[in-house]
Structure formats: structure tokens, C-alpha cells
Design a protein with these regions (language model features):
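Signature of uroporphyrinogen-III synthase
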Residues: 1-229
Length: 229
């Protein structure tokens, strides 16, 4: 059931669509009042262990949530993935810590798809994704006659609150966080985006869209600070 909670604690200037740690909040300029909450909540779907234990030549994982969902269904040592590709440095780090080596990573799904079209060995990939995802990767691969076997590894729920009118900017970390925001809010503020895929979605609705130099929360914070020097 959709609630009607409104967050408006006075002169809040910036809102993060992901819960921030105390250390991250301390990185903002002192003049800013910053609030945060998780605009999306994820939960692992059940994937049959027999499927995960079968041989998969080319595996694509586009988020840390996908990694965690896999490990929720099957022990890492039982996964039979020959070659792993992923999106994002933090996703790569988690995969290599928990599962095994990553052959190649890119900063977004579109860039990874273009790489795979050029360099993949074979003509099929197994793509572990959310029930809510962008079309870039499967579309680009299938247009190049690369078969995509999509597995919904986790589900995404949109749970953004209604924000107060004092908000001047919102920090977004995925296209899903933007869709969540739009369920109860109007795009009248600045959209600070973690990367190009998120910015592409934001530009459909927001007049002022800004993109971090590197895809990290800290880089988005730096982007915000630049507007309040």
C-alpha cells in the first residue's frame, strides 16, 4: 500500500535517494541541510540452484544487488560461471571478493553492451538483473545476434516519500530511483546523477541535470558542493 508521508523538516536543501552514512553527510558543505532515505528497496528472488550450478559461458551482472541475490540462492563455490562481465567498480570489487575474477567491467550497461558486441566469445549471455531495468544492454546485444537469457535475480520496490517544497536538489543513483521519486514528487529541482544512465533517465523529466565525474556517492556529493561554494 502506498503511504502519504511527507518529509519536510524546515529548510532542507538536498535529499539523497539513498540512505547516507554519517561520514558521507559530513562531506557536504556546512551551509547545506541534507536528508536521505532509500527510494528503492530490493529483495532477492528465488533462483533454482540447479540452474546456477549449470555451466554458463558468459555472465553479465550489472549491480551489487545482483551479486547478493546470487549468493542468497547458491554458495559461491557452486556457481559455474566461465566468464563474468559487470557494470561498476564496486560491483566488480564485490564479485571478485565473493565469486571470482571479472574479465571486463564498464561504467554503465550501454558501454558494456558495446564492448560485448566487439569482444565476446560465443553468441549468448546470461544476464542477472532486476525486474525493473533499462533496455540498453539486451537491445544492443540482440541487435547484434547475441542471445540474452535474462534472469530476474531480484525485485525492486519503489518507495520514495513525498518531499517538502524546500528541496533544491535530489541525488539519484539509478534510473529506478528517479521513477520512484516521480511517483509522489514533481521534477522541479536539480537532479544530481551518479552516472550517464541515470542522467539519461533524468533528462526526460528534469530541466537541470548534472552528472558526477565518477560513479560514486562521494563524487555526487562533490558535485552538489560545487553548486554551493
Amino acid at each position: 500500500m502506498i503511504g502519504t508521508t511527507t518529509i519536510d523538516n524546515g529548510p532542507t536543501t538536498i535529499f539523497s535517494s539513498k540512505l547516507l552514512s554519517r561520514g558521507q553527510k559530513d562531506l557536504f558543505n556546512n551551509a547545506l541541510k541534507v536528508e536521505s532515505s532509500d527510494f528503492i528497496k530490493t529483495s532477492a528472488n528465488r533462483i533454482k540452484p540447479v540452474f546456477l550450478k549449470a555451466a554458463h559461458k558468459n555472465v553479465v551482472i550489472t549491480s551489487k544487488n545482483g551479486v547478493e541475490a546470487l549468493l542468497n540462492n547458491c554458495a559461491a563455490e557452486d556457481l559455474n560461471f566461465e566468464t563474468i562481465y559487470c557494470v561498476g567498480r564496486r560491483t566488480k570489487r564485490l564479485i571478485e571478493q565473493k565469486i571470482g575474477p571479472v574479465k571486463h567491467s564498464e561504467k554503465n550497461a550501454k558501454a558494456l553492451a558495446k564492448y560485448l558486441v566487439e569482444f565476446i566469445e560465443g553468441s549468448e549471455v546470461t544476464y542477472f538483473c532486476s525486474d525493473i531495468r533499462m533496455d540498453d544492454l539486451p537491445t544492443i546485444l540482440e541487435e547484434s545476434n547475441i542471445k540474452v537469457q535474462e534472469i530476474e535475480a531480484y525485485s525492486t520496490k519503489l518507495e520514495a516519500p513525498k518531499l517538502g517544497k524546500s528541496i533544491e536538489g535530489v541525488m539519484f543513483y539509478s534510473p529506478s530511483t528517479i521513477q520512484s521519486f516521480l511517483q509522489k514528487n514533481t521534477p522541479e529541482c536539480i537532479a544530481y546523477c551518479i552516472g550517464e544512465s541515470t542522467a539519461k533517465e533524468a533528462k526526460k523529466y528534469f530541466k537541470d541535470v548534472r552528472v558526477a565525474k565518477i560513479p560514486t556517492v562521494e563524487s555526487v556529493i562533490e558535485l552538489v558542493n560545487q553548486n554551493y561554494i
